[in-house]
Amino acid sequence: MLKVTLVKSLIGRKKDHIATAHALGLRKIGKTVEHEGTPQIKGMINKISYLLKVEEA
C-alpha cells in the first residue's frame, strides 16, 4: 500500500494534472489517501510527483 498526500496546490496546474490528482482522490492540500501499488497508480503518481508526498504504508 502507498500513502499519497497532496502537498502543493492544484491552482494553475495543467488540466490533466488536476484530473489525475482528482482520480487519485486528492482535492485539498494535506489530504492523504491509500492506494495499492499497481502500475496504473504508480504511473499516475509519477505524472504529478512534484505535487505529492508518497510513503509506503
Curated annotation (Swiss-Prot):
One of its GO terms (cellular component) is cytosolic large ribosomal subunit. Keywords: Ribonucleoprotein, Ribosomal protein. The keyword Translocase does not apply. GO terms for biological process: translation. GO terms for molecular function: structural constituent of ribosome. The keyword Ribosomal protein applies. It holds the Pfam family Ribosomal_L30. InterPro entries: Ribo_uL30_ferredoxin-like_sf (IPR036919), Ribosomal_uL30_bac-type (IPR005996), Ribosomal_uL30_ferredoxin-like (IPR016082). CDD domains: Ribosomal_L30. NCBIfam families: rpmD_bact. Part of the 50S ribosomal subunit. Belongs to the universal ribosomal protein uL30 family. This is Large ribosomal subunit protein uL30. It comes from Clostridium perfringens (strain 13 / Type A). The gene is rpmD.
